[in-house]
């Protein structure tokens, strides 16, 4: 803008005021534009994007749009250049009628993030409406007797424009009789009068035709005309006169129908009929006034006949005419101004727009959820509206502009606590009494994967019988996820690990959807007592969340193993055992002992022995111990007894159903003077096919002696090497038993240790020597694994002979096959979390004092097949805590290990040997210097003797 220097200080002041005005508009947060009405389509209004500080490139992605409901189609924004333009015809008179100020209020909304801008477009009036009179002509009756300067009212024109465009000037066509007199009222309206300038003469001029022209102040000027038809009357020369030219009345918009508005008073100086006045509305009155009011023609009372509404029309201007009954009648006019007063009869209105739903439960605070617009048709305090939100919700209302509010997030959301919020927004005006309105906003909370699947308990215990069919269902795990939809879709899987040397997936599987756990193969209690593993539950969210649960599957024992007899094998099968018994032995003499084991556990492995009746019901002088299996005489044998007895011993376990095995014992009575070897040979000769066994035993003795000699040399060589080479730490650490379950809760060890069978000679294998090989722990370090084989090899690379401390004694080899004598039941717990099982216990008061006795394991964590044997009378004291027993039996196997050297001067009790009829004399041991070799040879000799006995 360029100012002339002539302007001086005035131009500077104008520039300063313009700058201050622009700064105020920017600070108010609203843009202001102005356009003339009737602008063509596409007319430029303003660069709204540039003025709002928005980039043109972000208009389309942010869905920049006009959101006003009332005037949305009048103006539009070009998203390509950000220009606000005229979209359809704008008529100021249609928008604002007679209002002096006319503006279009627009709401411009941009998403991501949500922003609201307010634009006010002022509509400028143009002179597009000419002045208009109500009719094409006005008829005026004027008596000829009227005096000069008499005035006669005429109706003016109306212009729909405002301002200068509605400022009317009137001109009257030239006339000798009348001139135009214009008066301006305080309501900015003009009253027109015809003033008589010359006496009328009806006979000379009965009618006059004048042209009244109204011209507005617009550019270009517009005009309107009306023809005035003046009829000159005779006689009645006094018109009615009102006591007031203008009547002013105020009515509440709630005024009831029939209420008296005002009473008009008019008088006529004439007498008689010429003085009677009749009231009526002017002929040019609007239809709206005729529907709202009525006037009594005789009394002049104006009454209300319809409801008023301040919001529709705030004031009424009523033209009332008083006409006398003279001939011709004379009339006069007055004006009644009715102002309608506002009453708080309109409740506020709420509109919820631009909902940003659903909202994520992890949405940040102050996130805009919705826009709320309030309005009230009342005015003043009755139209002032305040908004509020229901309490105790994580939302709040923020006033962004007059009558505009934003619903924003005030605190953190949790869909699992509440997934939908039903909000109530209340708008209340300032009237008395105040009116209010409510709007409900349903806010749905979208789920976020913030909850992992949870199991009902951290660990489950399952009991499964062994020998289950493959693929059987053993348990169902279930996890619940508090999230929704995909975030709550749980899938299950195994946490893979190894069970021994096999993968966990070889034993069990879990269905991914249902959580059912299946056993893929038959489980064997004798191989696996406890299977502990974890099942993982994972949801389908992004990122996925998961948790684990531990399953402890206890495999319950079934009676699926029959008792197995431990006896010498002939031709690969268990044959009959032949025993020689001297005649004339006393009652209770132990003839033989039937040895059997059962691979099951508990009552399924508790064996009892029964002697089957002889053929023909003959009585036999023998009996068998119910739980020991020892065959003894029931009386003193004499010459009358048979020389040979065939005894059938039935071995039966206590399972359901019970399984059995039968042992055959051939007892031959010989003279007491015969040597045991001769008796043995005689029995073998009687047996027939057993004669060849004697020769085998002879060769076996020779082989054992050779092996013993080689063992002594090996030990000497090994000792020399050990003295010359520093020992390697960890090379001789015994391995730990292989664990079925490797969890931190504790585990049960295998009841069946790994066994290695060693045969002393070629031919049919015999269980003469059982070497214990403990399973090595998988956690051994590399040096232990590398050095372990060196402990078992000599310098030549050949396997070394076993240590003499790990051999059997003759008594142990004989006693290891004996059954346990059980009298009462005790309780053995399988360790933490394991099942409680009833176990038989051992009584020290056995009826056979010479027989072997056992004590059951007591306390948690002891293997179910581990039993401590006691031999000989007197029931020796058991080893206390921290003491090592002299002998122990390998669980699940017939091997008994001697871990201590026998005392050199102690005698071996005869009850430690099972001679099956042969007496073994007591031998004294040499001193400790020569004790090892002598004892080793003696034990080998005893083994040979036992083999020959068998």
Curated annotation (Swiss-Prot):
Q: Where is this region: Disordered?
A: 752-808, 828-856, 871-890, 900-950
Going by the UniProt annotation, this protein carries glycans at 257, 265, 548
Q: What is this protein called?
A: Protocadherin alpha-1
Which loops or segments lie on the Extracellular side of the membrane, by the record?
30-697
Specify where the region named 5 X 4 AA repeats of P-X-X-P lies, as residue ranges.
Answer: 734-894
Name the GO terms of the biological process aspect. Answer: cell adhesion; homophilic cell adhesion via plasma membrane adhesion molecules; nervous system development
Keywords linked to the UniProt accession: Calcium, Cell adhesion, Cell membrane, Glycoprotein, Membrane, Repeat, Secreted, Signal, Transmembrane, Transmembrane helix
- Enumerate the PXXP repeat regions by residue range: 734-737, 799-802, 832-835, 873-876, 891-894
**Which organism does this record belong to?**
Homo sapiens
Give a GO cellular-component term.
extracellular region
Cysteine disulfide links: none
The record's annotation in Pfam families points to: Cadherin, Cadherin_2, Cadherin_tail
Task: Spell out the InterPro entries in the cross-references.
Answer: Cadherin-like_dom (IPR002126), Cadherin-like_sf (IPR015919), Cadherin_CBD (IPR031904), Cadherin_CS (IPR020894), Cadherin_N (IPR013164), Protocadherin/Cadherin-CA (IPR050174)
Question: What are the recorded GO MF terms, alphabetically?
Answer: calcium ion binding
The UniProt record lists the Cadherin domain at 30-133, 157-242, 243-350, 351-455, 456-565, 588-678
Q: Where is the signal peptide?
A: 1-29
Cite the SUPFAM superfamilies for this sequence.
Answer: Cadherin-like
- For this protein, the parts annotated as crossing the membrane are 698-718
Could you tell me which residue ranges are on the Cytoplasmic side of the membrane? 719-950
Function (record text):
Potential calcium-dependent cell-adhesion protein. May be involved in the establishment and maintenance of specific neuronal connections in the brain.
- Give the highest taxon in the source lineage: Eukaryota
Q: Which CDD domains match?
A: Cadherin_repeat (cd11304)
Report biased composition (Basic and acidic residues) as residue ranges. Answer: 909-923
């Amino acid at each position: 803008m360029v100012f002339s220097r002539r302007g001086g200080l005035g131009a500077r002041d104008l520039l300063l005021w313009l700058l201050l005005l622009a700064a105020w508009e920017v600070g108010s947060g609203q843009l202001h534009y102005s356009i003339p009405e009737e602008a063509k389509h596409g007319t430029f209004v303003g660069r709204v994007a540039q003025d709002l500080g928005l980039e043109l490139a972000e208009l389309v992605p942010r869905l920049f749009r006009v959101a006003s409901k009332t005037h949305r189609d009048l103006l539009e924004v070009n998203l390509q250049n950000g220009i606000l333009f005229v979209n359809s015809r704008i008529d100021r008179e249609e928008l604002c009628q007679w209002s002096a100020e006319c503006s279009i209020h627009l709401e411009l909304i941009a998403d991501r993030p949500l922003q609201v801008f307010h634009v006010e477009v002022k509509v400028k009036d143009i002179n597009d409406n000419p002045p208009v009179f109500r009719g094409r002509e006005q008829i005026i009756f004027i008596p000829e007797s009227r005096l000069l300067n008499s005035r006669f009212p005429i109706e003016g024109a109306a212009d729909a424009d405002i301002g200068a465009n509605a400022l009317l000037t009137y001109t009257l066509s030239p006339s000798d009789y009348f001139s135009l007199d214009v008066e301006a009222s305080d309501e900015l309206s003009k009253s027109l009068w015809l003033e008589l300038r010359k006496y009328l003469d009806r006979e000379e001029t009965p009618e006059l035709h004048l042209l009244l022209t109204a011209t507005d102040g617009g550019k270009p000027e517009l005009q309107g005309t009306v023809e005035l038809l003046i009829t000159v009357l005779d006689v009645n020369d006094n018109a009615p006169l009102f006591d007031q030219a203008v009547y002013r009345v105020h009515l509440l918009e709630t005024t009831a129908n029939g209420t008296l508005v005002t009473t008009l008073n008019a008088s006529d100086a004439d007498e008689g009929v010429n003085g009677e006045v009749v009231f009526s509305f002017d002929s040019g009155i609007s239809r709206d006034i005729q529907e709202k009011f009525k006037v009594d023609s005789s009394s002049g009372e104006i009454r209300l006949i319809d409801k008023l509404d301040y919001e529709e029309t705030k004031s009424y201007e009523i033209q009332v005419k008083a006409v006398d009954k003279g001939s011709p009648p004379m009339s006069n006019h007055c004006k009644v101004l009715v102002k309608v007063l506002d009453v708080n009869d309109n409740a506020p209105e709420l509109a919820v727009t631009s909902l940003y739903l659903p909202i994520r439960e992890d949405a940040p605070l102050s996130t805009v959820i919705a826009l709320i617009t309030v309005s009230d048709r009342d005015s003043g305090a009755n139209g002032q509206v305040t908004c509020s939100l229901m309490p105790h919700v994580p939302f709040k209302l923020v006033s962004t502009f007059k009558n505009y509010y934003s619903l924003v997030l005030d605190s953190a959301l949790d869909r699992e606590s509440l997934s939908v919020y039903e909000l109530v927004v209340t708008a209340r005006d300032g009237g008395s009494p105040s009116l209010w309105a409510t709007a409900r906003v349903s806010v749905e909370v979208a789920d976020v994967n913030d909850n992992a699947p949870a199991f009902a308990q951290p660990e489950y215990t399952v009991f499964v019988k062994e020998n289950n069919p493959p693929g059987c269902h053993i348990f169902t795990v279930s996890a619940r996820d508090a999230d929704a939809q995909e975030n709550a879709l749980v899938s299950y899987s195994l946490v893979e690990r190894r069970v021994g040397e096999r993968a966990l997936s070889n034993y069990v599987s879990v269905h991914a959807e249902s959580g059912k756990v299946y056993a893929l193969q038959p489980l064997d209690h004798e191989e696996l007592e406890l299977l502990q593993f974890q099942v993982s539950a994972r949801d389908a969210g992004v990122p996925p969340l998961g948790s684990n649960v531990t399953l402890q599957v206890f495999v319950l024992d079934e009676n699926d193993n029959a008792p197995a007899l431990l006896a010498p094998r002939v031709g690969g099968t268990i044959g009959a055992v032949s025993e020689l018994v001297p005649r004339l032995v006393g009652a209770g003499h132990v003839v033989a002992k039937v040895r059997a084991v059962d691979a099951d556990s508990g009552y399924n492995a508790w064996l009892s022995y029964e002697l089957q009746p002889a053929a023909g019901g003959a009585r036999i002088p023998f009996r068998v111990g119910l739980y020991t299996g020892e065959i003894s005489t029931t009386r003193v044998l004499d010459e009358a007894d048979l020389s040979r007895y065939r005894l059938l011993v039935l071995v039966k376990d206590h399972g359901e159903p019970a399984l059995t095995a039968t042992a055959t014992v051939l007892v031959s009575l010989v003279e007491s003077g015969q040597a045991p070897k001769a008796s043995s040979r005689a029995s073998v000769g009687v047996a027939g096919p057993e004669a060849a066994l004697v020769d085998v035993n002879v060769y076996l003795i020779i082989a054992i002696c050779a092996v013993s000699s080689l063992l002594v040399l090996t030990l000497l060589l090994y000792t020399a090497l050990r003295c010359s080479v520093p020992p390697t730490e960890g090379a001789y650490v015994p391995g730990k038993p292989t664990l079925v379950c490797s969890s931190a809760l504790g585990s049960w060890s295998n009841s069946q240790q790994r066994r290695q069978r060693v045969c002393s000679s070629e031919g049919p294998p015999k269980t003469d020597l059982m070497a214990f090989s403990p399973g090595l722990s998988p956690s051994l370090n590399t040096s232990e694994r590398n050095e372990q084989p060196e402990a078992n090899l000599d310098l030549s690379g050949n396997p070394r002979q076993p240590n003499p401390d790990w051999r059997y004694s003759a008594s142990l080899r004989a006693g290891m096959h004996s059954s346990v004598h059980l009298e009462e039941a005790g309780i053995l717990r399988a360790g933490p979390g394991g099942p409680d099982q009833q176990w038989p216990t051992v009584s020290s008061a056995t009826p056979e004092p010479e027989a072997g006795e056992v004590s059951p394991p007591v306390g948690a964590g002891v293997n179910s097949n581990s039993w401590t044997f006691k031999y000989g009378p007197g029931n020796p004291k058991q080893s206390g805590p921290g003491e090592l027993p002299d002998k122990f039996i390998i669980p699940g196997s017939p091997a008994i290990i001697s871990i201590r050297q026998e005392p050199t001067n102690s005698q071996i009790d005869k009850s430690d040997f099972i001679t099956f009829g042969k007496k073994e004399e007591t031998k004294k041991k040499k001193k400790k210097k020569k004790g090892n070799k002598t004892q080793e040879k003696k034990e080998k000799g005893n083994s040979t003797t036992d083999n020959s006995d068998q």
